[in-house]
C-alpha cells in the first residue's frame, strides 16, 4: 500500500499516534498522503472507518477523498470524511434534542435565506435600496461572528414569541433584518452554516455525556488545509481530540490566504506550542510544476519574514516537456496591449494543440478582467468567467451606463433602472402610476414624469431634481467629453456617493475601471467619438454571444483558483495597488498578498506568464510594476520587454515609500480609544474613536477646542 510513496509521505502515513503536523508544500501530494493514511489505519492497524474523522474544507475535496479511500480500502464505510459543517450536521442530527430542535431541522442555503429576507422585507416595508439581500446576508454573518457571538443562546433558549417580540420592537434596519431572520429560523427550525458549528460547540460545552460520547468515538482525527482554520473550528477540534489525543494536521503556511474570512496561520505555526510532543514532517517535493515555475515561486515567497523557512523541490525533469521555459514577464504600454498579449499567447498555444480549458487567466480582483474580456471577445476566443459576472453585467456598471443612456436617449429601460437609484422616493406605486399614464396617453415614462410633476403623488419625492439632472445634461452633453460627462454625472446624481456610503470598495474599483475604459475609447475612436457611438460600442461587448463548448479559457480570481491547477497560467494586472491590492494597510496583510501571489504562481504546471501595464487612472495614479515581480530574481524571468532604468528606479522608490507607510501604520495598530498620543505639529491629545474601515482616528488635542479626524498615516505616537 505504501510502496509507491516517497519517504516523507510514508512517514506521514505510518505515524499514527499523538500530535502530528505535516508542512506540505504546493503540489507535494498531500491528498495522496491523507488518503493512504486513512487506508493504513483501516487496513493495516484495523481501525473502524466510523472511528476516524477526516476534515477537508470543501465538499468537492471531501467527495474526491472519499472516492479515493473507497478504492484503497474496498470498504463502502468511509467514516466521517467531510467538512467541519457536514460533520456538525451529523452531530446535530444525532443530538438535536440537546438544543430543543427536531432531527428534521433544515440546513439553510442562500436561496432559503433570501426567501426569509423576502418575507421580512415585505412585512416591514424594507426595500433593496436600503440593503440588498447580499449585503443583508453579509451583515447577518458579521453579527453572528463578531458583534453578537452569543446570539445562539437566544435562538436556543428563547421561545418563538420572545424572538418575535425582539423582531417587532427593532427599529434600525440591520436589527429588523437580524432579529427577523432569527425569528424565521426558529419558526422553521432552520440553521445556516454559522449556526452548525456554534450549536455543536454549545452541546459539547453544556452536555458532558454527549461530549464524551463523540470524543471516545473519534479515535483518529485528520484535518486538511489547516492553514485555513478559523477560531471556532479550532475550538471544535480542541474539544474533539481531547480524549484520544490523536490529531494529524496538514497545511502550508505559505498558502494562508483567507485571514479576511477569519483564518489564522498562527494555529499552524504555533501547533507545536499548543500540543505536547508534536512531530513535524516536511513534504516539499513538488510533483506538479516545472523546475522554472518552482524557482519563480520559491524566489517570491522567500521575501516573507513570518514563515517557516522551506523551499519547494521540483521532481519533474527540466527536459521532460517542450513547453517548459522560464517564467514569462511582459510589460505593456497600456492595459489594452497587455490584454492583446495575453490573447495572442493563448491563440498561439491553442494553435499548437493546447485545449483552451488547459489555460487559466488569473487576477487579484474581478474588475481587472474588463480589458481582457473585450479583447477575447474581439478575437472570438471562448472563455468562461468563474465566480463573477462579466464586467459589463455588473450592477454598478449597468447603472452607470443607464445614466449615460438616459442622457442620450431618455429611454424607458434606463429610466426604470435609475430613477430611484440613489433613492428618490419613487417606488413601485409611483412607477405604476407613470406606466398607466403612458398606457393611456402615450409617450415615454420620463415624459410622463415631467407632465405629472405637480401631481400630489410626487410630493415628498426628489422627482423634480431628477428631471433637472437629466434635462441639464441632455442639453450640454454633446459639447462635453464622455469621460468628463461620466465623472460629473456620477457626482451630480449622487451615485458615487451612494457607493462610498455603502463602503463597497470593489464596486468603486469597477467604476474606476469603467472610467478607464472611457478614456481608452476616447483616445482610440477618432472623429466618431461621441456618446451614442460609445454606448453602441459597449452594447456590443455586453451582448456578445460566445460559442458554447468545452474548449474555453478559464478566467478567475486567484482565490477561486485555490486547489486547482492548469498547464498554462497567466496572472494579469501585476501592478502596485492592483496586486498587491491598494487596500493593504499592514505588513502582515502585505505578506498575505505575497502568499496569494505564491498560490497563483503554483497553479501553473508547464508555463507561467506574469503581465502588467503602464498607464494612469484616477483610482491608482501612475501604474508601477508589482513588487511581486521584483521579488523574483531576474535570472528566473524571461523579460519580453526590458524595463527602463528610470521605471525600475521609480517603481522601487514607490515600493520603498509604501513599505515605510505600512511600518508606520503597523506601529499604530495597538492604539485604542482613550490612549494619549502626540502629534508632530498639533501636540498632545487623546484618541476618542477609531474607524478601522475608513482608517481614521478621532483625536481631541489639548490646544484645539474641537476634535480632529486624522488618517492612520498621520504623524502621531503613543505617549
Give the residues covered by each predicted segment.
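Helicase P-loop NTPase motor core
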Residues: 22, 28-34, 276-279, 284-382, ...
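Conserved helicase C-terminal RecA-like lobe
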Residues: 163, 167, 369, 373-378, ...
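Conserved helicase NTPase motor core
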Residues: 3-14, 18-23, 33, 53, ...
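P-loop NTPase Walker
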Residues: 1-103, 107, 114, 188, ...
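C-terminal accessory regions
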Residues: 574-703, 710-715
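Short glycine-/polar-rich loops that comprise or flank the Walker A/P-loop
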Residues: 18, 47-51, 77, 243-245, ...
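ATP-hydrolysis module of ASCE/P-loop NTPase motor domains
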Residues: 15-16, 21, 76-79, 97-195, ...
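Short alpha-helix plus adjacent loop in nuclease-associated cores
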Residues: 87-95, 254-259, 288, 387-408
Amino acid at each position: 500500500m505504501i510502496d509507491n510513496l516517497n519517504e516523507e509521505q510514508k512517514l506521514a502515513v505510518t505515524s499514527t499516534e499523538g500530535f502530528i503536523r505535516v508542512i506540505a508544500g504546493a503540489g507535494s501530494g498531500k491528498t495522496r498522503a491523507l488518503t493512504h493514511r486513512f487506508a493504513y489505519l483501516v487496513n493495516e492497524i484495523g481501525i473502524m472507518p466510523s472511528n476516524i474523522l477526516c476534515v477537508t474544507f470543501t465538499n468537492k475535496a471531501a467527495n474526491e477523498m472519499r472516492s479515493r479511500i473507497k478504492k484503497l480500502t474496498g470498504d463502502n464505510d468511509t467514516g466521517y470524511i467531510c467538512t467541519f459543517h457536514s460533520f456538525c450536521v451529523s452531530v446535530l442530527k444525532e443530538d438535536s434534542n440537546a438544543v430543543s430542535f427536531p432531527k428534521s431541522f433544515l440546513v439553510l442555503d442562500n436561496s432559503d435565506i433570501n426567501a426569509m429576507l423576502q418575507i421580512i422585507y415585505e412585512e416591514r416595508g424594507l426595500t433593496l435600496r436600503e440593503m440588498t439581500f447580499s449585503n443583508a446576508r453579509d451583515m447577518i454573518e458579521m453579527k453572528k461572528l463578531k458583534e453578537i457571538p452569543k446570539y445562539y443562546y437566544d435562538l436556543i433558549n428563547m421561545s418563538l414569541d420572545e424572538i418575535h417580540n425582539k423582531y417587532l420592537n427593532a427599529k434600525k434596519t440591520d436589527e429588523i433584518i437580524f432579529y427577523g431572520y432569527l425569528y424565521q429560523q426558529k419558526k422553521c427550525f432552520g440553521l445556516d452554516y454559522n449556526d452548525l458549528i456554534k450549536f455543536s460547540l454549545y452541546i459539547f460545552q453544556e452536555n458532558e455525556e454527549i461530549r464524551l460520547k463523540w470524543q471516545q468515538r473519534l479515535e483518529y482525527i485528520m484535518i486538511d488545509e489547516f492553514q485555513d482554520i478559523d477560531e471556532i473550528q479550532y475550538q471544535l477540534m480542541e474539544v474533539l481530540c481531547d480524549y484520544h489525543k490523536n490529531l494529524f494536521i496538514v497545511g502550508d503556511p505559505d498558502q494562508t490566504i483567507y485571514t479576511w474570512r477569519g483564518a489564522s496561520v498562527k494555529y499552524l505555526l504555533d501547533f507545536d506550542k499548543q500540543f505536547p510532543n508534536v512531530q513535524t514532517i516536511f513534504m516539499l517535493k513538488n510533483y506538479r510544476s516545472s523546475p522554472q515555475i518552482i524557482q519563480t515561486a520559491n524566489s517570491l515567497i522567500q521575501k516573507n519574514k513570518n514563515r517557516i523557512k522551506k523551499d519547494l523541490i521540483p521532481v519533474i525533469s527540466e527536459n521532460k516537456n517542450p513547453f517548459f521555459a522560464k517564467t514569462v514577464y511582459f510589460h505593456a504600454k497600456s492595459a489594452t496591449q497587455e490584454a492583446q498579449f495575453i490573447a495572442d499567447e493563448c491563440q498561439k498555444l491553442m494553435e499548437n494543440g493546447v485545449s483552451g480549458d488547459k489555460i487559466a487567466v488569473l487576477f487579484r480582483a474581478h474588475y481587472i478582467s474588463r480589458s481582457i474580456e473585450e479583447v477575447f471577445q474581439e478575437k472570438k476566443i471562448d472563455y468562461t468567467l468563474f465566480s463573477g459576472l462579466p464586467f459589463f453585467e455588473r450592477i454598478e456598471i449597468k447603472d452607470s451606463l443607464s445614466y449615460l443612456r438616459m442622457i442620450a436617449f431618455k429611454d424607458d429601460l434606463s429610466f426604470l433602472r435609475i430613477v430611484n437609484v440613489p433613492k428618490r422616493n419613487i417606488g413601485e406605486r409611483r412607477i405604476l402610476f407613470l406606466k398607466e399614464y403612458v398606457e393611456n396617453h402615450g409617450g415615454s415614462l420620463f415624459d410622463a414624469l415631467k407632465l405629472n410633476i405637480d401631481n400630489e403623488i410626487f410630493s415628498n419625492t426628489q422627482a423634480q431634481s431628477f428631471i433637472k439632472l437629466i434635462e441639464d445634461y441632455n442639453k450640454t452633453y454633446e459639447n462635453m467629453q464622455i469621460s468628463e460627462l461620466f465623472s460629473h454625472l456620477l457626482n451630480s446624481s449622487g451615485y458615487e456617493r451612494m457607493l462610498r456610503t455603502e463602503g463597497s470598495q470593489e464596486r468603486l474599483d469597477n467604476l474606476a475601471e469603467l472610467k478607464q475604459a472611457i478614456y481608452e475609447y476616447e483616445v482610440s475612436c477618432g472623429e466618431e467619438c461621441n456618446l451614442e457611438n460609445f454606448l453602441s460600442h459597449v452594447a456590443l461587448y455586453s451582448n456578445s454571444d460566445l460559442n458554447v463548448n468545452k474548449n474555453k479559457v478559464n478566467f478567475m480570481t486567484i482565490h477561486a483558483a485555490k486547489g486547482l491547477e492548469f498547464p498554462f497560467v497567466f496572472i494579469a494586472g501585476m501592478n502596485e495597488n492592483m496586486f498587491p491590492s491598494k487596500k493593504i494597510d499592514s505588513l502582515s496583510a502585505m505578506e498575505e498578498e505575497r502568499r496569494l501571489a505564491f498560490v497563483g504562481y503554483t497553479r501553473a504546471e508547464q508555463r507561467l506568464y506574469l503581465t502588467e501595464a503602464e498607464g494612469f487612472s484616477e483610482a491608482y495614479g501612475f501604474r508601477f510594476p508589482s513588487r511581486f515581480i521584483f521579488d523574483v530574481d531576474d535570472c528566473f524571468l524571461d523579460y519580453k520587454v526590458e524595463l527602463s532604468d528610470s521605471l525600475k528606479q521609480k517603481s522601487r522608490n514607490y515600493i520603498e515609500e509604501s513599505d515605510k507607510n505600512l511600518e508606520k501604520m503597523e506601529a499604530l495598530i495597538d492604539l485604542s480609544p482613550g490612549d494619549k498620543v502626540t502629534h508632530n505639529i498639533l501636540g498632545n491629545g487623546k484618541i476618542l474613536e477609531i474607524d478601522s474601515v475608513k482608517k481614521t482616528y478621532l483625536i481631541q488635542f489639548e490646544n484645539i477646542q474641537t476634535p480632529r479626524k486624522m488618517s492612520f498615516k498621520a504623524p502621531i505616537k503613543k505617549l
